[in-house]
């Protein structure tokens, strides 16, 4: 019986995938293949390449200033180029072709002009991941074979169908958004948390523009920032798509870390996310073992 691991989208919440993998392996459950969408493709690629230990060490050492250092502003095709981040991975991790990784791996992207779902199963691993994480309006699209590719979460946020196509008999899926939608723009949280990296960036921009933009009197409603509106809108859309797709293509098992308190760009909070991924597996480990132990 081949076990497939489908890692869902969710930006910084995706660090929980590391905890999920650690907990599965500790329990003696070793996936035979892995696929991912957006941040799920990043963690999945590190796992498939045998680089998860080094990747986790890098995550745990990340600070807000490191996140800000990867923000290369462009405003052409997106707010950020994403080149600094990809260059970092090329410099610090081996960029093997997808087909040469130690474990079967694939990433999901979306063809920008047709809306088609694209499965990236060969070529540069770094380029495949970069295409899968290209969140519209935030990161610029990636051109591959003449096709502009953006975030796979637009069409398949939790790629159960891809895991099946790769030959999985049983699929363990990880959904990072099940308890998030509708909470970020509540009346009690109208602005970005100053503790998030994007909140820090927005604060600096606001300081630069002080005297140019109208101020909001204390106590009055303050509209959400542009990045918050964008990210919340994408999050709502992906949650609805994920629910619809998994209703027709259900996994054999679902792991759902509780990450409502996590901002999509809290990349510096890896330790908390990893621990939550471990907790989510521990909470349903008995059922998971029973499922995996079924005779093939």
State where each predicted segment sits.
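Patatin-like phospholipase
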Residues: 1-37, 45-296
């Amino acid at each position: 019986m081949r076990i497939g691991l489908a890692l869902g989208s969710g930006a910084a919440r995706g660090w929980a995938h590391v905890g999920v993998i650690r907990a599965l392996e500790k329990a003696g459950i070793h996936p035979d293949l892995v696929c991912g969408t957006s941040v799920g493709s990043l963690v999945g690629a590190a796992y498939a390449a045998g680089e998860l230990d080094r990747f986790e060490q890098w995550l745990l050492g990340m600070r807000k200033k490191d996140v800000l250092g990867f923000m290369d502003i462009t405003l052409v095709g997106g707010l950020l180029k994403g080149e600094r981040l990809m260059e970092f991975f090329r410099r610090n991790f081996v960029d093997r072709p997808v087909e040469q990784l130690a474990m079967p791996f694939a990433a999901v992207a979306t063809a920008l002009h047709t809306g088609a779902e694209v499965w990236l199963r060969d070529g540069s691993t770094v380029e495949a991941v970069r295409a899968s994480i290209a969140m519209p309006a935030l990161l610029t699209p990636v051109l591959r074979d003449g096709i502009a590719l953006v975030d796979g979460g637009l069409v398949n946020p939790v790629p159960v169908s891809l895991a099946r196509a790769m030959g999985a008999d049983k699929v363990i899926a990880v959904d990072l958004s099940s308890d998030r939608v509708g909470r970020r723009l509540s009346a009690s949280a109208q602005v970005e948390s100053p503790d998030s990296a994007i909140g820090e960036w927005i604060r600096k921009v606001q300081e630069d523009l002080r005297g140019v933009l109208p101020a909001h009197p204390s106590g009055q409603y303050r509209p959400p920032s542009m990045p918050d509106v964008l990210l919340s809108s994408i999050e709502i859309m992906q949650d609805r798509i994920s629910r619809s797709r998994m209703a027709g293509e259900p996994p054999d098992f679902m792991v759902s870390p509780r990450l409502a308190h996590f901002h999509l760009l809290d990349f510096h909070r890896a330790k908390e996310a990893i621990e939550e991924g471990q907790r989510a597996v521990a909470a349903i480990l008995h059922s998971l073992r029973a499922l995996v132990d079924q005779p093939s």
